[in-house]
Amino acid sequence: MIIAALARRELKEGDLSELSRLGMAAAEGPSLFALPGYEREKAWARLVANDVALWRQDKLEWSEVGSGALVYGPPGTGKTQFGQAFANALGLKFVSTTVGKWQKAGHPDDTLRAMHQSFAEAAAADGAVLFIDEFDSLGHRGMLHGERYQLYWQIVINEFLSLMTNLPDGVIVIGATNFRELIDPAVLRSGRIEEHFELSLPDDRTRFSATT
C-alpha cells in the first residue's frame, strides 16, 4: 500500500499509518488529520508527508521538501497543538523551543549558542519538526532602534537566516507568533518560512467536534 502511494506521490490518511515501516518515529498525541478544522493546513501537511516519505526512500532531495511554515493568530488558537499534531501526522520528532529561551542569557554568544543547540537537537532526530514559539521576538531589522540594540538583533537574525539556508536534512521549522507583522521579511521569504497559516479561535461546531 505504501509503495503504491509513494509511486503516485500522494499519501492518503490511511497510508500515513504505514509510515512507521519507513523508519519514521512514533509520536504521542493526535495526528493533525484526526483534529477538527485545520483544513488548509491539512492539505499542506499531506503534500509534505508525500515528500518526506519520498525523501526517506532516497527518491527526493531534502531541498525539494518544504522547509518551514508560520502559524499566527491570537492566543488560544492552537498554534502549539498544530505543531505537535503536524509532527505526529508525519511521524517526526517534535522539538519545541522559544526565542525567549534563546535570549535568556542575554549575551549574543549565548543566544546564538542556544539557537544552534535547538537546530542540532532537531538534526540529530533523523526527522523532526523544530517548533519555535514567540517567533516575532527574532526581531525586524526595519524596526530596530538604537545602535547597540540594532547590532545585537542583526547578528541574531543573520545567524537564523544562515541556519535556515543550511537547514539540516530531515528538519522542518514551524514558527508561531501572535504578531506576524513584527517578523523580518527576510525570514518569511520563499525557501525559508514560506508557508503562512492564520489560525482563528475555534467556532462552536469545531469545539463540539473536538470534545466528541
Model-derived features: positions:
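Interdomain "pre-motor" coupling segment immediately N-terminal to P-loop NTPase/helicase cores
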Residues: 1-28
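Intrinsically disordered, low-complexity regions
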Residues: 16-19, 29-32, 57, 164
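Short hinge/gating elements
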Residues: 26-34, 196
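Walker A/P-loop NTP-binding motif of AAA+ ATPase domains
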Residues: 36-212
